[in-house]
Amino acid sequence: MAQDVLTDLNKVRNIGIMAHIDAGKTTTTERILFYTGVNHKIGETHDGASTTDWMEQEKERGITITSAAVTCFWDKNQINIIDTPGHVDFTVEVERSLRVLDGAVAVFDGKEGVEPQSETVWRQADKYNVPRICFVNKMDKLGADFYFTVDTIISRLGAKPLVMQLPIGAENDFIGVVDLLEMRALVWPGDAKGDVTMGASYEVQEIPADLQAKAEEYRAQLVETVAEASEELMEKYLEGEELTLEEIKAGIRKMTINSELYPVFCGSAFKNRGVQPMLDAVVDFLPNPLDVPPMIGHDPRDEEKELTRKPSADEPFSALAFKIAAHPFFGQLTFVRVYSGHVEAGAQVVNSTKGKKERIGKLFQMHANKEMPVEGATAGHIYAAIGLKDTTTGDTLCDANNQIVLESMSFPEPVISVAIEPNTKGDQEKLSTAIQKLSAEDPTFQVSLNEDTGQTIIAGMGELHLDILVDRMRREFKVEANVGKPQVAYRETIKRAVERLDYTHKKQTGGSGQFAKIQIAIEPMDTASGELYAFENKVTGGRVPREYIPSVDAGIQDALNDGVLAGYPVVGIKATLIDGASHDVDSSEMAFKIAGRMAFKEAARKANPVLLEPLMDVEVRTPEEYMGDVIGDLNARRGQMQSMEDAAGVKVIRAHVPLSGMFGYIGDLRSKTQGRAVYSMTFNSYAEVPKAVADEIIQKTRGE
């Protein structure tokens, strides 16, 4: 069967399961694998036995950190699932999985509705135009409210949900759903009946009398919405004709793929209810690789020349590497999404991003951390490859005679860092190996050396992210080291333009000297596009020889690593080389690089330099009686209130708070609210640090 599917892309779905932490994504994935026959025993996250959570830390913490790719079959369709982490520190995993998916299932907690991380992941899916269906999970939970959750999809996500099912019962009495497409009830046998099928079988019944009117009302809304899918359907609807089941399904499919609406289903993955209809919906409504527009890229020799690749085995081979993972036996696994063409295991391809030849050793389709070897990789599928030496996340692999560079992924800058000091020389060597492997796997993990102290500084997306990286260094690479306290990753920028600064670098020490004269301008630059630095050359008449111009740029970039205020990296700068002069004998690339570095430092001091800090979106859910204490505490941490609202019996407070004020927050919040409040935090943006606070930080870093 697998071979037939490979040739028929209509029967393939590449999907992600995405949600807020603890909404039940991994449990939902486990149920899918159980019902599709991949697993014979259900793995529970809280037992540490889940298939997709296969790294030691994931099993211990009960959270998903790396996106495991799993292949399964449902109703003769192949579904490739990527289980993505919901914890904000691992947004990079979500980002890269969404980049290579065609559709997604957004899982919501039936009690909490849309939570902050659900919003973050939803926005990421919007960025990559990923069509979605919604699964309101945990309908068996105390306080679960399907209709409240649907309302939050409208109010918090600004999305258009299409209700496909209504829950029958709630909390402990949740037994099934009303299917609004076929106007019938699907009821799962309860535990009391001793359900030996683990929810694999359910009964089709009449709609309960108390839900009949509501079901008819929602069915009418569904049909009215679907009629908008095409003129033919609208005409038929307005003339009072019944739309057939096939017409309704086709209309929903079309509108879902265009992201005009999001079909909503409900269930309880933990109690084995509602998962199969959601799987049917994945096949019925989410796109196959042929429904997705052709991939756009550019010619590696000419960035202006746009190229496209259709999802067909007849097109030239192209694939995007979206994840690197270490494997206990094979070494490095590179996960790739093949967008066009076909490639055999053992073939030579080109990494067009880096301009290097690569050989694909072996190819696998993955089931979490079990591998199924395959002979070749075909358009529309996700594979793991071994043997790729130079390929990292975001690189394109392609046919040597038809090269293309596919659009890559953009990753956020780290916001937090710790110093790490190996205990012995042997540990230093192990640390180097660990850093090399971990940074290949994770683009948001950055490493630098503090030249003043000789310490290695590792930076990441949050305290949990760094905890897990350090934990992996100790466990997998046996590194023994002292780890410092977390530090905020501050940045520096300028507020004023300097229109002209002349700098001459001159050194005469017998024999040939060094000479470079340049005139530069610098100005602030908006970083919203993700671009942190730009360089322009306006020199005319060869006054600075062409071969020295990249050296000036390199010198300025060198200076950006180490700002003039407190030595933090500088962002949001446009530098222009206006004029200069050289000497036939004494000028060199090094002389112009030094001139670029020193000129920038001098100009930056005159450009009103300021310190920037990461500002976080913080959401706290607290019982009403603690609201005053929580708000007072956030204000004391320099927080700015954004909104307050009621949700599911608690107060939801949203604020912007500097990251520096959030260290140790969880302990303080617990003691202020007797452990009854919860919070979540996502990165918002970098913002200017108030002068009094900035002066304190600068004095501290200078050791004053």
Swiss-Prot record:
N-terminal signal peptide: none
GO molecular function term, any single one: GTP binding
tr-type G domain boundaries: 10-290
Annotated localization: Cytoplasm
Pfam family, one: GTP_EFTU
Keywords: Cytoplasm, Elongation factor, GTP-binding, Nucleotide-binding, Protein biosynthesis
Binding-site residues for GTP, renumbered to this chain: 19-26, 83-87, 137-140
Protein name in UniProt: Elongation factor G
Organism: Paenarthrobacter aurescens (strain TC1)
The encoding gene: fusA
